[in-house]
Regions:
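Short loop/turn motifs that connect adjacent beta-strands in outer-membrane beta-barrel proteins
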Residues: 19-26, 62-66, 80, 139-148, ...
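Solvent-exposed, glycine/polar-rich loop segments of beta-barrel outer-membrane systems
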Residues: 87-113, 198-223, 271-300
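Extracytoplasmic gating/loop element in the C-terminal half of outer-membrane beta-barrel translocons
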Residues: 180-277
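Transmembrane beta-barrel strand/turn architecture of Gram-negative outer membrane proteins
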Residues: 49-61, 149-158, 163-196
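Gram-negative/organellar outer-membrane beta-barrel architecture
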Residues: 1-142, 148-149, 217-218, 222-224, ...
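C-terminal structured "cap/appendage" subdomains that terminate the fold
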Residues: 276-331
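Outer-membrane beta-barrel architecture
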Residues: 14-16, 52-56, 132-134, 151-153, ...
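Transmembrane beta-barrel strands of outer-membrane/channel proteins
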Residues: 2-4, 29-35, 69-75, 148-156, ...
Length: 346
């Protein structure tokens, strides 16, 4: 797996033995290197470098169900500087093996000088136990029209880790035939992470984001929820999203490669930890991003998915229903009605 972009570089090697024993247990060995400068394209600068190795076992329970158990060891280095948000610098200064690095001024002559700066760095090792359960009865993986899928994943940083936390993710997807070729599709996702022991908050790279084609359409990608000291998305440790779609019947010859729908999306991300101190648009007034039903953003619109040789092209046009316009203190929501992405089908 090789993935190199403007904000991240991911290099991974994995090997799967689908039949480790006669019971159909699969074993996967993996080695991954990540170098990330921004967790999403709109984030403030934040350098994260990690090296991990893991082993994962998948055990089939029934035709539709399976269990997964895995262990991984990871060494992470996080660096923040003057272009980093105050919240990120807070975390780096309070967790792991924190050190301050002074970068001296560099004079290249002819008036070209790079001023000196101070970097905050931390390094830590974590050892994660991952347990997962899945159920999938869909009639097909792509453009399904009946059946359901559940996925539950629990990740726990073992007590001898330098940074301790736990993360839980639950995904739900179901297709319900109504009449003829008309079908309703429902989906929901809940993600939560919690610090443990002396750790002040889950690592920033464990934050969840919302807004955009995969969560709440009609709002700019990853722009919902907590904002850092520069007004950029910082993410949160709690994510709640859901959607409902009415799948419009497609002519038989297009049914395997195209789909249109009318949708309703709802969701947001929140920060339930007391460690971070967020401020509003004025840079002074304290603001909170705790969970609240009135903070769940909603939108409705139309969507089209088309299976092309490069992947599934997804187009949507959404009308946000409860955009927060800002009040001089809290940041306003950012709308983006037409959205396009290439990725997994709904």
């Amino acid at each position: 797996d090789l993935n190199s972009g403007r904000y991240s570089k991911v290099y991974g090697i994995s090997h799967t033995d689908p039949y480790t024993n006669i019971d159909g247990v699969a074993r996967t060995l993996s080695f991954t290197y990540r170098d990330v400068t921004q967790f999403v394209s709109a984030s403030s600068d934040f350098s994260s470098e990690s090296l991990s190795i893991g082993v994962d076992y998948g055990y089939p329970i029934t035709e539709f169900q399976g269990l997964r158990v895995g262990l991984s060891a990871q060494r992470s280095s996080l660096i923040t500087g003057e272009g980093s948000a105050q919240q990120a610098r807070q975390w780096v200064q309070s967790n792991g093996d924190y050190r301050q690095q002074i970068v001296p001024e560099q004079d290249f002559g002819e008036g070209f000088v790079i001023p000196g700066t101070t970097l905050d760095t931390t390094q830590f090792d974590s050892y994660d136990l991952v347990i997962g359960w899945s159920y999938d009865s869909r009639n097909r993986a792509l453009f399904a029209d009946r059946g359901m899928r559940h996925s539950l994943s629990l990740s726990y940083a073992l007590p001898f880790s330098d940074v301790q936390y736990a993360t839980a993710n639950y995904d739900y997807l179901q297709f319900v035939p109504i009449i003829g070729s008309w079908t309703m599709a429902f989906a929901a996702e809940v993600g939560y992470s919690q610090e443990l022991g002396d750790t002040t908050a889950p690592p920033p790279y464990r934050n969840f984001f919302a807004g955009g084609p995969d969560t709440v359409r009609g709002f700019r990608e990853s722009r919902l929820g907590p904002k850092d000291s520069f007004g950029n998305p910082y993410g949160g440790n709690l994510k709640v999203t859901a959607r409902a779609e009415l799948l419009i019947p497609t002519p038989e010859k297009w049914r395997a490669s195209a789909r249109a729908s009318i949708f309703f999306d709802i969701g947001n991300v929140f920060s339930t930890t007391d460690f971070y101190k967020f401020t509003g648009a004025d840079g002074v007034t304290p603001v909170e991003y705790k969970f609240g039903y009135d903070k769940l953003r909603q939108s409705t619109g139309i969507a089209v998915q088309w299976l092309a040789p490069l992947g599934v092209f997804r187009f949507s046009y959404a009308l946000p229903l409860n955009t927060f316009e800002g009040d001089g203190v809290q940041f306003a929501d950012e709308e983006e009605r037409f959205q396009f992405t290439i990725g997994q089908a709904f």
